Regions:
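Membrane-interface transmembrane helices that cradle and orient dolichyl/undecaprenyl
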Residues: 15, 146-147, 184-197, 223, ...
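Signature aromatic-anchored transmembrane alpha helix within multi-pass, membrane-resident enzymes
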Residues: 39-43, 146-154, 235-243, 293-294, ...
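Catalytic lumenal/periplasmic loop and adjoining terminal transmembrane helix
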Residues: 54-60, 250, 390-523
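Transmembrane-helix motifs of polytopic, lipid-linked glycan transferases
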Residues: 115-143
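Hydrophobic/aromatic-rich transmembrane helices and adjacent perimembrane loops
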Residues: 170, 176, 182, 208, ...
Length: 606
């Protein structure tokens, strides 16, 4: 009886223990995904904050293409019936997916897009570090034994952010760094055994660059055969890529292949040997030490017969081959289109650095004493010392490259802050000139080609509806409103205005320019808070719109042709002495010879 009682009690205790283990296992089962999701949310928030601070601190502003992408979103939200993709920039579905929802926030769209582009570019370093960390094969070790993999990840992350041309692309808010990040994110997801997420990243990258189509298609075939439950996702992704690239242009432009048509005859196309030209652009993304490190990683992959490393090497080579084919077709094959394979090579170089460090450190102390006694151990010790020496030489040879990149970043940031001044002041100039509606009423807006999309975005117009050939438009005698950057601000001039509109359009003629820098004397009579900001130098230059008096001659920038070959295609400023007049002051018939008028703002109303 006692035996049966003890047997039942032991069984109940075992059952209770198994139930506890089941509950604890279940709790760990749902806690781990939550922890992973929380960590990713934290990293995403930090990267987003870094992107916003990068936008604020560096003066990053969108370029011609990026303003054109933002115009697409604003046109769909504000004037969807007039939305068209007929002109520059080339159609990219990836950017449209972001600029469309951002357009709902008005002019905050600029901040949202620039911060998103900056954050995505900075995230490329994160995914490069994670990919190199996993490629070392040391991720399953204890934390303290992973230090070679951590060094490999740091090397790859910093190396990708140091790609030549990446600072400029980040500061003008283009989509190319974003595509680099998506490709590296797909690699990281695949190495983390998340093929569905990897395919989704490849689909997004394929919406940004056509070179990714080949890799997305190959990965779709592999997922269809090897990954259970992924066929619906694969089918949707395969259909989304051509739909995004061709359906919308077919509905909003004269050609469904408008992106390829606009890329033909681009100024960056290669005119000589296409193969040599593309390879030269690819190798120019980094200096010789990094090239040798990537080549060493490829040799190491061949020696070890690592399929993953060899597959990544083949993918990088295939990307370069696709770019060569594009160059033969007449497309530009620019340097920024080769950043993706260069980033993959840097990841491989970082992983090779990690494996060399692990080989040099693994059992080095244990083999140091026997190395002095036996030849076999001595040879192994020499190999370990050689691996460590290679890493040290690589680090020393990259030190000048790091200094050059720091100087490059400083120069790019300084230039970006200068370029940001007229871009930021254009919105205020448009407001002081009466707003977009009045400006469009007075005539077609015209500016220089570099500011065409910027002006279109500020006036809520399509890029193609803004003129960019100033001289031709001025001499055409059609009603126009001419915008020209001047003295940190803008000159706005309505020209050839219809007689019935002249009274209403008189307000449009302004000189919105810098009149001074706030000083301590400026703070007199201001509220205390504003005066404190003036004294501390928080406020920037003071801008004042100056309007022209009625009847004054318009001072505009025109385009004239001269008989002398050296004076052709020069811009002339009416009301200011022209450069050709100073070189030939006695030349007869020159319209500006010996003439010097008052500045445009003298005597004007404030």
């Amino acid at each position: 009886m006692a035996a049966s009682t003890s047997l039942r009690s032991s069984r109940s205790a075992a059952a209770s223990d198994s139930a506890k283990r089941t509950r604890s296992g279940a709790s760990r089962g749902w806690r781990r995904p939550l922890a992973v999701a929380g960590s990713w949310l934290l990293v995403g928030a930090l990267v987003a904050l870094a992107g916003y601070e990068f936008y604020r601190w560096t003066g990053a502003r969108p370029s011609y293409d990026a303003f054109g992408w933002m115009v697409w979103g604003r046109q769909v939200v504000l004037h969807w019936s007039s939305f068209n993709t007929d002109g520059a920039p080339s159609w990219k579905p990836l950017t449209f997916l972001l600029t469309l929802p951002y357009a709902l926030f008005g002019h905050t769209q600029l901040t949202l897009w620039t911060a998103t582009s900056s954050a995505a570019a900075l995230a490329s370093g994160v995914f490069a570090a994670r990919s190199a960390f996993r490629l070392t094969g040391l991720a399953s070790r204890p934390l303290l034994a992973r230090w070679p993999a951590l060094i490999a990840g740091t090397f790859a992350g910093v190396g990708v952010l140091g790609l030549r041309g990446l600072p400029h692309q980040m500061l003008i808010a283009t989509s190319d760094p974003m595509v680099v990040t998506l490709c590296l994110a797909a690699l990281d997801a695949h190495l983390s055994r998340r093929p569905r997420l990897a395919f989704a990243m490849l689909v997004l990258a394929a919406l940004g660059r056509p070179e990714v189509w080949t890799f997305a298609g190959a990965y779709a075939v592999w997922c269809w055969r090897a990954v259970r439950g992924s066929r619906i996702l694969v089918a949707a992704g395969v259909l989304l890529i051509p739909a995004g690239w061709f359906v919308i242009p077919a509905l909003t432009s004269h050609s469904w292949f408008i992106s390829g048509d606009l890329a033909l005859g681009f100024r960056d196309q290669i005119y000589g040997n296409k193969i040599v030209g593309v390879f030269d652009r690819f190798t120019s993304l980094y200096e010789l030490p990094m090239q040798l490190a990537a080549l060493g990683a490829i040799v190491l992959a061949v020696v070890r017969r690592d399929r993953t490393w060899l597959a990544l090497t083949a993918a990088a080579a295939l990307w370069v081959a696709i770019e060569i084919a594009f160059a033969y077709h007449g497309w530009p094959a620019s340097q920024r289109y080769l950043m993706e394979p260069a980033a993959v090579c840097i990841v491989l170089a970082g992983a090779a650095v990690g494996q060399l460090l692990d080989f040099a450190a693994r059992g080095a102390a244990a083999h140091l004493l026997p190395a002095l006694l036996t030849r076999q151990s001595f040879g192994e010790w020499v190999l370990r010392a050689g691996a460590l020496s290679l890493v040290a030489v690589l680090a020393l040879s990259l030190a000048p490259v790091v200094r050059a990149r720091v100087r490059l970043w400083r120069g790019e940031i300084h230039h970006a802050k200068i370029v940001a001044v007229p871009i930021d002041q254009l919105e205020h100039a448009v407001a002081f000139a009466g707003g977009p509606t009045l400006i469009r009423y007075c005539g077609q807006p015209v500016t220089f080609v570099g500011f065409q999309s910027t002006l279109a975005w500020n006036l809520d117009m399509n890029v193609g509806n803004v003129g960019y050939k100033a001289g031709r438009e001025i001499h055409s005698r059609r009603p126009i409103v001419f915008f020209a950057p001047f003295n940190g601000g803008w000159l706005v001039r309505p020209l050839h205005t219809r007689r019935r509109k002249q009274l209403a359009c008189r307000r449009v003629s302004i000189d919105y320019q810098v009149v001074g820098q706030p000083t301590g004397a400026t703070a007199a009579g201001l509220p205390p808070a504003l005066a404190r900001e003036v004294r501390e130098g928080v406020l920037g230059p003071l801008y004042v719109p100056r309007r022209l008096r009625p009847g004054r001659p318009h001072h505009v920038i025109t385009h004239r042709r001269h008989r002398s070959s050296h004076a052709r295609s020069r811009h002339h400023v009416k009301g200011h002495r022209h450069a050709a007049a100073s070189r030939h002051p006695n030349r007869r018939g020159h319209p500006h010879a010996g003439h010097q008028s008052r500045p445009a703002h003298r005597g004007a109303k404030t």
